[in-house]
UniProtKB/Swiss-Prot annotation:
This is 4-hydroxy-3-methylbut-2-en-1-yl diphosphate synthase (flavodoxin). One of its GO terms (molecular function) is iron ion binding. Belongs to the IspG family. The keyword Iron applies. Converts 2C-methyl-D-erythritol 2,4-cyclodiphosphate (ME-2,4cPP) into 1-hydroxy-2-methyl-2-(E)-butenyl 4-diphosphate. Its cofactor is [4Fe-4S] cluster. The keyword Cytoplasm does not apply. InterPro entries: Dihydropteroate_synth-like_sf, IspG_bac, IspG_bac-typ, NO2/SO3_Rdtase_4Fe4S_sf. GO terms for biological process: isopentenyl diphosphate biosynthetic process, methylerythritol 4-phosphate pathway; terpenoid biosynthetic process. HAMAP family: IspG (MF_00159). [4Fe-4S] cluster binds at C270, C273, C305, E312. It comes from Salmonella typhi.
Amino acid sequence: MHNQAPIQRRKSTRIYVGNVPIGDGAPIAVQSMTNTRTTDVEATVNQIKALERVGADIVRVSVPTMDAAEAFKLIKQQVSVPLVADIHFDYRIALKVAEYGVDCLRINPGNIGNEERIRMVVDCARDKNIPIRIGVNAGSLEKDLQEKYGEPTPQALLESAMRHVDHLDRLNFDQFKVSVKASDVFLAVESYRLLAKQIDQPLHLGITEAGGARSGAVKSAIGLGLLLSEGIGDTLRVSLAADPVEEIKVGFDILKSLRIRARGINFIACPTCSRQEFDVIGTVNALEQRLEDIITPMDVSIIGCVVNGPGEALVSTLGVTGGNKKSGLYEDGVRKDRLDNDDMIAQLESRIRAKVSQLDEARRIDVLQVEK
């Protein structure tokens, strides 16, 4: 691969969500949110575990009622990934989930109650070492800011965020991160740019209500990609009207594309044409599903003919170049073997898993040598 200089990330303070470090150069955390009824403990636990299997670092859970808070207690006991409780309007729910071991509170100080109630929540968070996320959203901007600016603008979102930041500052609380989300890509991007210049707290990125699986992924890739390429962002969520598992997959794909954080197989595949010597699309789709369990970073190129195949294979960990009846297999840029086109999926899966084992063993030996 081309040796692109690493992105210089914005300097930010360090907080922890559970055991996950956020900010100050820590890996950008990928998170999602459950869409089950929180009171359905079994369904919510199953979804959280599914998110964890595909790499979720943090999972947010909506806690709108006291019944949901009681369910949260049971959920927390059954999962290991850090949980963020999403809370609005009722400060007592925040106090209750804090008692039950929540790892982070997502609140807006402006809608959680009066000054005394805000102080109670912040004091509780401080006592239990629980960070807070201030979540500003263009769709729920304060009425006076709507009237002042006429519509959601970057300046309006910034002013809203700074109100809440100043509120926590007055309470001498600095364990928080901030988001300024909007469904419009340009509005969100410019809002984050302004905020990044104003504070040194970690920033949680997201294009809110981005849309369905395809359109939402595109909008998120553009918006988050712009910010991440400028070094802005410490955690992210890809918001999709789809299975939350897809949010995690797309989030990691965005980070992989920018070479910020790699997880699992990075497939490089041609869009196919009449020159393809085997079913490239079917092969890629099948392998993506079969190899979801792999977390070891690896580039695998799957090209259907010899036009671009050899060149891509030279810079991939493993590469396949389509040929008549048999296709060339490259390993670390060197042609090693030929695979039967009629049995491509099974053969390539076997080779990939063998290479993963080899890489994992090499890393294990390196770690042992360092420890000695």
